[in-house]
């Protein structure tokens, strides 16, 4: 029986480019070589597609060490220089349409997790891992996610949405509105980025301008939310029509909140599996995660994050990640490993779920 060809798509134009490469490297290492032939497909920061030797060489890089020893900018510049000096030509889309049986999407953030690559694959009729166009797009937008899960009866942090154009047209009015509606601290975040990129915790009015301008550099829509008390608790969900829910996990940030540097550079955060909350709260978090997954129309996989206040028993949904990280420190594979599903079997199941769903038949 001939092997099925899996396009492992990684890199991309988002600020999470480097993390995508680390995820793809982990995934490639465990795909069953007796069932699947892996075709690495690397997308540069500028959006140029490569396969073959150059893509394979990118997968061999120790990006995790590069991020720790240099910086995000320096690592990105190294990758750009490699792309500029490769003699290889760009990707042949005719081959893509004819030679791929399914795709494992290992892209994170914009242009990968937001429905765009999913729409392209649907157009070509290629099955792929994870959520479809609509669920991906809605979950990527934190403001839209809040609307959807609130309708399903799931609590979210009090917040408002601000367009960057509104802020720049009248900064003082925006600041005044925020000050009148919230007590400090608040979080200011781009509506559609992951890995905590562009997020600031604001403790007083003097920090607000810098936080708003930082968020506006990354997105045209900004979310301002009340900072919630409690533990950061995460749940992994896997499946299509009958999703499985992992046990809970907890993040204890190494800094004031779980930001990009804490996640991928300093590695200072502590993880607890299961989360240090009561069994009753753990079960309720798992139920809320499944409700959110279904409300958004998710398929394949998602990691769903909450704030849990044990004193009050309050559970608040923070965000839904439709393509969670697959790095050595990523919570999604760790949660399923702790639930009895090893990493290689997790990847195998994701490929099976992709093949179960005809392209274009998912939300």
Curated annotation (Swiss-Prot):
GO terms for molecular function: ATP binding; D-alanine-D-alanine ligase activity; metal ion binding. Transmembrane segments: none annotated. Its EC number is 6.3.2.4. Mg(2+) 2 binds at residues 319, 321. It catalyses: 2 D-alanine + ATP = D-alanyl-D-alanine + ADP + phosphate + H(+). It is an enzyme of class 6 (ligase). Pfam families: Dala_Dala_lig_C, Dala_Dala_lig_N. It comes from the Bacteria. PROSITE patterns: ATP_GRASP, DALA_DALA_LIGASE_1, DALA_DALA_LIGASE_2. GO terms for cellular component: cytosol. Its main location: cytoplasm. Belongs to the D-alanine--D-alanine ligase family. PANTHER family: D-ALANINE--D-ALANINE LIGASE, D-ALANINE--D-ALANINE LIGASE A. This is D-alanine--D-alanine ligase. It comes from Chlorobium phaeobacteroides (strain DSM 266 / SMG 266 / 2430).
């Amino acid at each position: 029986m001939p092997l099925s060809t899996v396009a492992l798509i990684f890199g991309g134009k988002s600020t999470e480019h480097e993390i995508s490469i680390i995820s793809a490297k982990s995934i490639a290492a465990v795909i069953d070589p007796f069932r699947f032939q892996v075709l690495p497909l690397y997308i540069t920061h500028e959006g140029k597609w490569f396969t073959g030797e150059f893509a394979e060489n990118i997968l061999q890089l120790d990006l995790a060490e590069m991020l720790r020893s240099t910086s995000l900018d320096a690592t990105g510049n190294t990758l750009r220089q490699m792309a500029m000096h490769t003699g290889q030509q760009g990707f042949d889309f005719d081959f893509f349409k004819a030679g791929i049986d399914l795709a494992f999407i290992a892209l994170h953030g914009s242009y990968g997790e937001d429905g765009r690559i999913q729409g392209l694959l649907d157009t070509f009729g290629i099955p792929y891992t994870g959520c479809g166009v609509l669920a991906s797009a809605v979950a990527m937008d934190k403001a839209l996610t809040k609307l959807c899960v609130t309708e399903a009866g799931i609590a979210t942090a009090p917040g408002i949405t601000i367009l960057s154009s509104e802020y720049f047209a009248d900064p003082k009015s925006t600041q005044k509105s925020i000050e009148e509606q919230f007590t400090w601290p608040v979080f200011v975040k781009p509506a559609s980025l992951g890995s905590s990129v562009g997020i600031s915790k604001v403790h007083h009015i003097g920090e607000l301008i810098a936080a708003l301008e930082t968020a506006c550099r990354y997105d045209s829509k900004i979310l301002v939310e009340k900072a919630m008390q409690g533990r950061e608790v995460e749940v992994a969900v896997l499946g299509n029509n009958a999703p499985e829910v992992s046990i809970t996990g907890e993040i204890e940030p190494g800094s004031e909140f779980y930001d990009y540097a804490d996640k991928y550079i300093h590695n200072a955060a502590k993880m607890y599996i299961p989360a240090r909350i009561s069994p009753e709260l753990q079960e309720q978090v798992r139920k809320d995660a499944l409700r959110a997954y279904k409300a958004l129309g998710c398929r394949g996989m998602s990691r769903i994050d909450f704030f849990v206040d044990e004193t009050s028993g309050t559970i608040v949904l923070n965000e839904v990640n439709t393509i969670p990280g697959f790095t050595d420190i990523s919570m999604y594979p760790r949660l399923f490993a702790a639930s009895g599903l090893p990493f290689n079997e997790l990847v195998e199941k994701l490929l099976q779920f992709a093949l179960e769903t005809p392209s274009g038949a998912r939300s």
